[in-house]
């Protein structure tokens, strides 16, 4: 089994971050706020953020990456908007599904892991958004820990600085459970990344992917 690596995705590289969305219906973000570097967060927490992969490792949970379409008893998929196409790179595992438009940005990255170990999904998901707080000049636009199709889920959306660019990212993590008798648990992550100054122009496609994202029993 392997350590779980999650990421806020660029087409050429993966950096650790977890970001996600709302349960039923998607709240349209205020894209005019994306370029700002001041945080919208008004409350503070005494708990230091613990990146989700680090938390899973600390409780003895490991994962094997699997193709999103291969989960028995579950449907995991995203739509491909017009003008988008599959993206491949030698550094990307074959189980990773990536679609992109016009090259590097915008991109959507879908990954799934078969989990091993004893854990409480409701506790694990509490750390689903922690990674985002560690990014340079991260500005939160939206956040949720509401269930997604009945499964534990975490969502965060925002913008941050990376390699001299301002990026906008939407990310959802879902922990679905397959049917009996095995009731196998998985971790599914969808991350959509665009240049912040193009987020408004790309918003229709991004929202179409968000609305069409499926994690549900067959």
Curated annotation (Swiss-Prot):
Keywords: Cell membrane, Lipoprotein, Membrane, Palmitate, Signal. It holds the Pfam family Lpp-LpqN. It is found in: Cell membrane. A lipid is attached at residue 24 (N-palmitoyl cysteine). Its main location: membrane. It comes from the Bacteria. InterPro entries: Lipoprotein_LpqN/LpqT-like. Residues 1-23 form the signal peptide. One of its GO terms (cellular component) is plasma membrane. It is a lipid-anchor. A lipid is attached at residue 24 (S-diacylglycerol cysteine). The keyword Lipoprotein applies. This is Putative lipoprotein LpqT. It comes from Mycobacterium leprae (strain TN).
């Amino acid at each position: 089994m392997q350590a779980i690596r999650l990421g806020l995705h660029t087409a050429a590289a993966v950096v650790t971050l977890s970001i996600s969305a709302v349960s039923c219906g998607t709240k349209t973000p205020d894209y005019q706020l994306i370029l700002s570097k001041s945080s919208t967060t008004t409350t503070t927490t005494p708990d230091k953020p613990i990146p989700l992969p680090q938390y899973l490792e600390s409780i003895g949970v490991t994962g094997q990456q699997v193709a999103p379409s291969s989960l028995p008893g579950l449907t995991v998929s995203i739509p491909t908007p017009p003008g988008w196409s599959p993206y491949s790179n030698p550094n990307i595992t074959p189980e990773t599904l990536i679609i992109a438009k016009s090259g590097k940005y915008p991109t959507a990255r879908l990954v799934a892991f078969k989990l091993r170990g004893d854990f409480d999904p409701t506790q694990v998901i509490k750390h689903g958004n922690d990674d985002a707080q560690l990014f340079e000049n991260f500005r939160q636009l939206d956040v949720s820990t509401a269930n997604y199709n009945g499964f534990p889920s975490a969502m965060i959306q925002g913008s941050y600085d990376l390699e001299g660019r301002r990026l906008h990212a939407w990310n959802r993590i879902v922990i679905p459970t397959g049917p009996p008798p095995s009731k196998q648990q998985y971790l599914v992550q969808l991350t959509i990344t665009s240049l912040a100054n193009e987020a408004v122009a790309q918003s229709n496609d991004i929202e179409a992917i968000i609305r069409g994202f499926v994690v549900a029993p067959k």
